[in-house]
């Protein structure tokens, strides 16, 4: 059975800049105007990342546009947002991202089947320039292969 996901925002750049070693799902604490703005699809997680502050994990640099109809009760667009994770998951994440070179990157934001906003996180290690070139060459080669197959 396929899981229902209404994708709000994706971070395609993260897949290019990082090796994603592990993926996990987290809830996120939002205000009402933020949820309404997300329903309209006005969000960007291009440069967002998560870090730990003691025993909690926060998502930074995630842009959720202001909701136009929430006049004076609007939210700050790039405020840090708390991620909802189990204690075991938090300890595991903290242990992994304390290792040099690892970071916690937001990969996508979506509504699940219960209409809750979820964030897909990835424990990632940064790619070097030559790794990025390899991934570009690999992508080009796959594109050329599909062209050759279509021509036959």
UniProtKB/Swiss-Prot annotation:
Keywords tagged on the record: Cytoplasm, RNA-binding
Which biological process, per GO, is one annotated for this protein? trans-translation
Name the GO cellular-component terms: cytosol
Q: Which PROSITE patterns match?
A: SSRP
Q: Where does it localize?
A: Cytoplasm
Task: Provide a Gene Ontology MF annotation, just one.
Answer: RNA binding
Family affiliation: Belongs to the SmpB family.
Q: What does this protein do?
A: Required for rescue of stalled ribosomes mediated by trans-translation. Binds to transfer-messenger RNA (tmRNA), required for stable association of tmRNA with ribosomes. tmRNA and SmpB together mimic tRNA shape, replacing the anticodon stem-loop with SmpB. tmRNA is encoded by the ssrA gene; the 2 termini fold to resemble tRNA(Ala) and it encodes a 'tag peptide', a short internal open reading frame. During trans-translation Ala-aminoacylated tmRNA acts like a tRNA, entering the A-site of stalled ribosomes, displacing the stalled mRNA.
Record-given protein name: SsrA-binding protein
> Whose protein is this, by species?
Rickettsia massiliae (strain Mtu5)
Source species taxonomy: Bacteria, Pseudomonadati, Pseudomonadota, Alphaproteobacteria, Rickettsiales
